[in-house]
């Protein structure tokens, strides 16, 4: 066990996970920790509005593949992160959302800028946890970051402001990084059979292809099947547009060629996509989603499998 302050423990966990950039606006509820950022190699990017910080964090992670942190002052500042956090959630962007909270001693008594911050984000994050004891600061933060990475979505840590500057005995927690699991034998066998017998297979590539570093794998299977590749809404980066089999994005502001081609598919291989409405509902008067095709869906979130027919 080592003695250190709660903010030192917090920063050490950030370093363990390689978090080097934070975006947002820092208020009095987070100032003790921000003083440690420069020496820890963490760059804080101040913005004019909290929403900008969240949107930049989303864009940063989507373009670099590195998880970032967004911060705002408790109460009204945190409410400014609602739009970017929900956006990141639907974009499958892992992100650490840090929400300083009113002091634990005054919670429920109308503490300084007290807001139900956990309820505010409960349907916008894949995981959320409030620090209930200063000695558990590192443990909770480590778990929240891991959940964000595993769930490929924002995760929230809520920290009462009076938990900073406390000296604690602590042992830094280990990082337990789960390996990406393969599909079940029977499911993969059935998928292979469907693709082998397909007369006109079409691939739909989504965010998971990018996040899973699987663009080259997607290219290989497309070339093996000689299958055109459509990209999901907002995920043009999931397949190189210069490739001969690339036909563009589906749905809103999408490619008519992509819509016409996928409408003829007898098997659709949906890779790394939750099959959201913007990639499946009619566009430009074209009801393109193939009603009779077999759908092979591969996605990190099992709750989304089979949700869209």
Regions picked out by a protein language model, each given a short descriptive name:
Residues 1-309:
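N-terminal alpha/beta PP-like core and its mobile active-site loop of ThDP/TPP-dependent enzymes
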């Amino acid at each position: 066990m080592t003695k250190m302050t709660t903010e030192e423990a917090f920063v050490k966990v950030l370093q363990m996970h390689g978090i080097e950039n934070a975006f947002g606006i820092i208020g009095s509820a987070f100032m003790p920790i921000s003083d440690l950022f420069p020496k820890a190699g963490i760059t804080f990017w101040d913005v004019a509005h909290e929403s900008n910080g969240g949107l930049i964090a989303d864009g940063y992670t989507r373009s670099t593949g590195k998880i970032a942190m967004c911060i705002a002052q408790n109460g009204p500042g945190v409410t400014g992160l609602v739009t970017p956090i929900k956006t990141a959630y639907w974009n499958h962007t892992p992100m650490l959302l840090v929400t300083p909270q009113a002091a634990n001693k005054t919670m429920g008594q109308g503490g300084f800028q007290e807001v139900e911050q956990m309820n505010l984000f409960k349907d916008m994050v894949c995981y959320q946890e409030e620090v209930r004891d200063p000695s558990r600061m590192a443990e909770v933060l480590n778990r929240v970051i891991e959940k964000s990475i595993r769930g490929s979505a924002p995760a929230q840590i809520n920290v009462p402001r009076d938990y900073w500057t406390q000296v604690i005995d602590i042992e830094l927690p280990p990082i337990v990084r789960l390996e990406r699991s393969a599909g079940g034998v029977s499911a993969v066998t059935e998928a292979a059979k469907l693709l082998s017998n397909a007369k006109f297979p079409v691939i739909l590539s989504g965010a998971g292809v990018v996040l899973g570093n699987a663009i080259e794998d997607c290219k290989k299977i497309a070339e093996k099947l000689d299958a055109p590749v459509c990209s999901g809404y907002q995920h043009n980066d999931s397949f190189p547009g210069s490739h001969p089999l690339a036909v563009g994005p589906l749905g809103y502001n999408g490619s008519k060629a992509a819509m016409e081609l996928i409408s003829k598919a007898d098997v659709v291989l949906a890779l790394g996509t939750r099959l959201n409405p913007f990639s499946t509902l009619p566009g430009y008067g074209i009801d393109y989603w193939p009603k009779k095709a077999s759908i092979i869906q591969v996605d990190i979130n099992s709750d989304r499998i089979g949700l869209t027919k």
